[in-house]
């Protein structure tokens, strides 16, 4: 059998194959089993290559993977940023190229380590997970599509997230890939490599321990007080959402759906999505009074997504916020989005990039919230994660440490239409529930609205672009 050095082009094909398998392991389509073998072709291609060659192969795999996972960015940039497709694709490839540097760096470091006697069986999972963690905060952080998130539907496996976060599962998946790679090398290489007996045994033991822990957690009964929530998915078309002419119709939709959801009696919590009201709730008295009257009528605490502002002398700070209204119609709290979307809600280093606002229409000028603030409902505190804050474990953990017993994710994924983005977004919020052992409810303008218990069960979820106003009760801690 010819060595893998014989046909360089084949090495790039194999690296690209790893990228394709990685992309397919995330929703949609979400063939999660592929994640456990997806990196084997890349590892085989790297073989005994020079570290610089391994870097290029890792970059190829990463570029293909992230291009397949994040294709939906073009939908938002072209449709709502009003950029030409050619410009959008350049921006998209720049992002995919940046993210591809992480698997490229992994391949490079692992090969250099092997040249110095450090086994890939140890180095590969450690370096992969270490770089996943760095990616979660470097350059504002973008922990999208970490390996472990591919398993969000495999509940016995993901229970370890309350101990290790998503990174524990990423480690297991990376270890599985490198063990399989070494087994194949042992069969196929000219110079027979030693079979990774110890590493394979460790992998099996870790998987058995993970599954045992998972099944144990899944069979523990929930104990606590009942809690009822009504989630409102208004399905407001993004193209008219901010048109003042549609404000009346938008408020009317949420009034109607909220009344139907609470027709059998008050809910402990009613949740409207991110920016459900397309105006400043603080000073649009005509509609604000209607919403206050509605909460009194429903006799339910209500979370309302709305932009907000704060004055500091002559300076005005704009915020992406969630207001909590009491059953008596009073605004009793506000939670401001802390982790903003770069180039969506603000321009990083705006002083050095003044041209960006001129190129891309619709970039916001929001300021980050100052602190984590749980909101008290009378039936327990809630922590509100606005939009893609749900992908950051430390934010969810901060709200739970601040006393929140339910996490609430309000979002508007209408930007991405019927792509895989809403499904990928949902998959990450499943981990926030398991990591903190609290239920998480999410209300999305056009979907996916969902109710997730503390073990990661998705108890209810919507389809995209449907009107929904479910009422659900469960036991929470």
Curated annotation (Swiss-Prot):
UniProt-annotated location(s): Cell inner membrane
GO cellular component: plasma membrane
Annotated catalytic residues: 274 (proton acceptor), 337, 387 (nucleophile)
Ranges that cross the membrane: 20-40, 58-78, 89-109, 118-138, 155-175, 195-215
Pathway: Protein modification; lipoprotein biosynthesis (N-acyl transfer)
Keyword annotations: Acyltransferase, Cell inner membrane, Cell membrane, Membrane, Transferase, Transmembrane, Transmembrane helix
Enzyme Commission number(s) of this protein: 2.3.1.269
An MF annotation (GO) of this entry: N-acyltransferase activity
Membrane topology per record: Multi-pass membrane protein
The keyword Magnesium belongs to this UniProt entry's keyword annotation: no
NCBIfam families: lnt
Keyword Kinase: no
One annotated GO biological process: lipoprotein biosynthetic process
Enzyme class: transferase
Family as reported in the entry's similarity comment: Belongs to the CN hydrolase family. Apolipoprotein N-acyltransferase subfamily.
Chain ranges of the CN hydrolase domain: 232-477
Stated name of the protein: Apolipoprotein N-acyltransferase
Protein role: Catalyzes the phospholipid dependent N-acylation of the N-terminal cysteine of apolipoprotein, the last step in lipoprotein maturation.
């Amino acid at each position: 059998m010819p060595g893998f050095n014989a046909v360089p082009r084949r090495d790039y094909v194999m690296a690209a194959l790893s990228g394709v398998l990685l992309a397919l392991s995330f929703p949609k389509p979400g063939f999660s089993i592929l994640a456990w073998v997806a990196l084997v072709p890349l590892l085989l291609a790297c073989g005994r290559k020079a570290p610089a060659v391994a870097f290029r192969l890792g970059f190829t795999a990463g570029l293909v993977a992230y291009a397949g996972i994040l294709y939906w960015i073009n939908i938002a940039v072209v449709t709502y940023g009003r950029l030409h497709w050619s410009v959008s694709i350049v921006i998209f490839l720049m992002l995919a190229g940046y993210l591809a540097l992480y698997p490229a760096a992994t391949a490079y470091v692992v090969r250099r380590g092997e040249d110095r006697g450090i086994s890939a069986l140890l180095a590969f999972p450690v370096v992969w997970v270490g770089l996943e963690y760095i990616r979660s905060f470097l350059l504002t952080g973008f922990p999208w599509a970490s390996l472990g998130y591919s398993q969000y539907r495999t509940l016995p496996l993901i229970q370890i997230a309350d101990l290790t976060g998503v990174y524990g599962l990423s480690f297991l998946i990376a270890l599985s890939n490198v063990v399989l790679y070494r087994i194949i090398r042992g069969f196929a290489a000219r110079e027979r490599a030693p079979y990774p007996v110890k590493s394979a045994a460790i992998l099996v033991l870790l998987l058995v321990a993970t599954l045992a822990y998972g099944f144990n957690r899944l069979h523990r009964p929930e104990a606590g007080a009942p809690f009822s929530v009504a989630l409102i998915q208004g399905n407001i078309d993004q193209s008219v959402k901010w048109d003042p002419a549609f404000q009346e119709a938008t408020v009317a939709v949420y009034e109607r759906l909220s009344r139907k959801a609470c027709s059998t009696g008050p809910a402990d919590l009613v949740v409207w999505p991110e920016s459900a009201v397309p105006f400043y709730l603080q000073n649009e008295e005509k509609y604000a009074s209607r919403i206050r009257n509605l909460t009194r009528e429903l006799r339910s605490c209500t979370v309302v997504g709305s932009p907000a502002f704060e004055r500091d002398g002559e300076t005005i700070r704009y915020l992406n916020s969630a207001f909590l209204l009491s059953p008596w119609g009073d605004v009793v709290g506000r939670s401001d989005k802390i982790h903003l979307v770069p180039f969506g809600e603000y321009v990083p280093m705006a002083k050095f990039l003044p041209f960006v606002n001129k190129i891309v229409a619709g970039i916001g000028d929001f300021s980050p919230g100052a602190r984590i603030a749980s909101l008290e409902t009378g039936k327990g505190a809630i922590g509100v994660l606005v939009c893609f804050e749900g992908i950051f474990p430390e934010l969810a953990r901060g709200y739970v440490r601040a006393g929140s017993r339910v996490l609430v994710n309000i979002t508007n994924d209408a930007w991405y239409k019927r792509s895989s983005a809403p499904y990928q977004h949902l998959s990450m919020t499943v981990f926030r529930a398991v990591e903190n052992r609290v239920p998480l409810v999410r209300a999305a303008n056009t979907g996916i609205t969902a109710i997730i218990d503390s073990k990661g069960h998705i108890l209810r979820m919507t389809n995209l672009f449907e009107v929904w106003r479910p009422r659900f009760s469960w036991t929470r801690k």
